Design a protein with these regions (language model features):
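Conserved Rossmann-like nucleotide-cofactor binding loop
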Residues: 175
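Conserved beta-strand edge residues that scaffold enzyme active sites
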Residues: 63-64, 147-149, 183
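N-terminal beta-strand motif that seeds the catalytic metal site of vicinal oxygen chelate
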Residues: 2-43, 118, 122, 182-185, ...
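Vicinal oxygen chelate
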Residues: 2, 42-43, 99-172, 195-206
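Core segments of cupin and vicinal oxygen chelate
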Residues: 38-91
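A short, polar/proline- and glycine-enriched secondary-structure boundary/capping micro-motif
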Residues: 92-97, 188-192
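Residues that flank catalytic or metal-binding motifs in active/ligand-binding sites
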Residues: 31, 69, 77-79, 114-116, ...
């Protein structure tokens, strides 16, 4: 086995997620190829994601038979955020398709099968700078949420137990977006809760 192939094989045994956990043994997934959302106005969507957030528009499609459009934006690391525009798309419903409030401001429940929000990863050293940049662009941004393992799962202050910092805002169609910055590696102790069934019962992890 040559050096390149050997290195690739070694890397395939470890996840590149924080902490070097074992990788997926079934499928060697490389992350998100793209997430596809639906917008009301593609021109407005391009203006927001490309001109305001700086995401390059990398692919555009006109769908056949007047069905609409499908555009792709580069969000880094080879991943894309994509949007459909359908001429006769149904109107969004708060609390069903989109969260009614920003996190920390009210109810963020959305329907089963919905995409509650999209979080973009940023370096922790740029987190505060980027929050101010969004504000300077006229975007309403939530207070910073320092996620930890406390009873409320959020702290007003950054401390060693915080694992990710978050800020939330919306795109022109009300889609909930987040800039998130990991602040520490995740380990076995971070997986300590049994998943809930449909009735709310917690079951043991296998």
């Amino acid at each position: 086995m040559n050096d390149i192939a050997s290195t690739a094989a070694e890397e395939a045994t470890l996840s590149d997620f924080r902490g070097g956990r074992p990788a997926n043994p079934e499928f060697q997934l490389r992350g998100i190829n793209h997430l596809a959302l639906v917008c009301r106005d593609m021109a407005r969507t391009v203006e927001f994601y490309q001109d305001v957030l700086g995401m390059p528009l990398v692919k555009t499609l006109e769908l056949p038979s007047g069905m609409g459009q499908h555009f792709f934006f580069d969000i880094g690391n080879g991943d894309c955020l994509a949007f459909f525009w359908f001429p006769n798309a149904p109107e969004p419903v708060e609390g069903v398709v989109t969260a009614a409030a920003l996190p920390g401001d009210g109810d963020i429940t959305t329907a089963i099968g919905s995409m509650n929000h999209v979080a973009f990863d940023v370096a922790p050293e740029h987190f505060d700078e980027y929050r101010q940049k969004l504000i300077d662009k006229g975007i309403r941004v939530s207070p910073v949420m320092n996620h930890d393992d406390s009873e409320t799962t959020v702290s007003e202050h950054l401390h060693p137990g915080v694992f990710v910092r978050s800020m939330y805002f919306r795109d022109p169609d009300g889609t909930l977006l987040e800039l998130a910055a990991w602040t520490r590696n995740l380990g076995a102790a971070d997986v300590s809760h049994g998943p809930a069934t449909a009735t709310g019962e917690r079951v043991a992890l296998s």
